[in-house]
Amino acid sequence: MRMLVSKSIFAEPEPGYYAHTPVSLVICAPNMPDLLSHRLEDGFRAASRHAEALAKLQYRDPNAKDVLGFQLAFSTTKSYWDYVEEDDPECGQRFSKAMRAVTVNKLGDVPKLYPFNKLVDDGGIIVDVGGGMGQVAQSILSHWHGLGLKCIVQDKFASKSGSTHPDLEMQSYDFFSPQPVKGSAAYLFRHIFHDWPDDACITILKNTVEAMNPHQSRILICDQIMEETNPSTAAVLYDIDMMCLYGGKERTLSEWEELLKAADQRLEIKNVFRSPNQVSGILEVQLCCD
């Protein structure tokens, strides 16, 4: 306890008596132990072999087929996603619960940050790509209720019976395949692209562009937008974590622009929505039709 007090995780108001701090209360939050477990059991193991993996790559950015710290630490040739699906479902469950903790703590950011009411005139259909169990979609519908918005939550393991909201539909979909929902007002990607290297992201974006209505559809990317210089400690730690486990990375605004142009020269960032003192934001991307 003394060590935890010295790190400001707990307080010691008087000798022999200990009290919670804001830090310890966060640790007690629902699913937070799963997030810590994911970071320690998966992230730290992968990080322990990160330097070795980088040396094998000759210190270049990885692509989707490269061997990463994760593969070396877990003695596999499979990607993280294939590994947890096929070989270690317990690891996959740990990740799912960890992401649930992240979603719960950040749930209010998305519906408040972007003016979803502007989508109504373009049909009001929001496709939440890789949207998991639909928590974010439900928060959008609750915050902007009564406007006629509808959400389609796409996830590889989505269950059609998993939706309890009348304006929410669950749809099984792998975003490396052609997008089946055409001409939606918005295609939302929340914390998707930072899990993947550029070549994989380009494939996802190209599949999305093929489905877009060039005059009204937009892509909404909710992800970190790193500072161009002197990024925060939190941002660079996430950046390393993404590379060790998945081969992904956090991106600066200029890197987002380069990625979008690599997928389709017509893609342009029209607006950037950010909260003060927050690394994450929402990029509103549309096709430029001159």
UniProtKB/Swiss-Prot annotation:
Binding-site list for S-adenosyl-L-methionine: 155
Listed EC numbers: 2.1.1.-
Active site: 194
Root EC class: transferase
Disulphide bonds in the chain: none
SUPFAM superfamilies in the cross-refs: S-adenosyl-L-methionine-dependent methyltransferases
Stretches that traverse the bilayer: none
Applications: Aspergillicins show innate immunity-modulating activity. Innate immunity is a good pharmaceutical target for the development of immune regulators to suppress unwanted immune responses, such as septic shock, inflammatory diseases, and autoimmune diseases. The innate immune system also provides targets for the development of agents that stimulate protective immune responses toward some diseases, such as infections with pathogenic organisms and cancer.
Pathway: Secondary metabolite biosynthesis
GO terms of molecular function: O-methyltransferase activity
Family matches, as PROSITE patterns: SAM_OMT_II
Keyword S-adenosyl-L-methionine annotated: yes
Disruption of the gene: reported phenotype: Impairs the production of aspergillicins A and F but accumulates aspergillicins C and G.
GO terms of biological process kind: methylation; secondary metabolite biosynthetic process
Keyword Lipid biosynthesis found: no
Keywords: Methyltransferase, S-adenosyl-L-methionine, Transferase
Protein purpose: O-methyltransferase; part of the gene cluster that mediates the biosynthesis of the aspergillicins A and F, 2 cryptic cyclic hexa-depsipeptides. The hexamodular NRPS agiA catalyzes the condensation of the six amino acid residues including N-Me-L-O-Me-tyrosine, L-proline 1, L-proline 2, D-isoleucine, O-acetyl-threonine, and L-isoleucine. The starting condensation domain (C1) of agiA probably loads acetyl-CoA which is condensed on the N-terminus of threonine by the first module to yield O-acetyl-threonine. The second module then loads L-isoleucine.
PANTHER family tied to this protein: O-METHYLTRANSFERASE ASQN-RELATED, PUTATIVE (AFU_ORTHOLOGUE AFUA_4G14580)-RELATED
Family: Belongs to the class I-like SAM-binding methyltransferase superfamily. Cation-independent O-methyltransferase family.
Protein name (Swiss-Prot/TrEMBL): O-methyltransferase agiB
Source species: Aspergillus flavus (strain ATCC 200026 / FGSC A1120 / IAM 13836 / NRRL 3357 / JCM 12722 / SRRC 167)
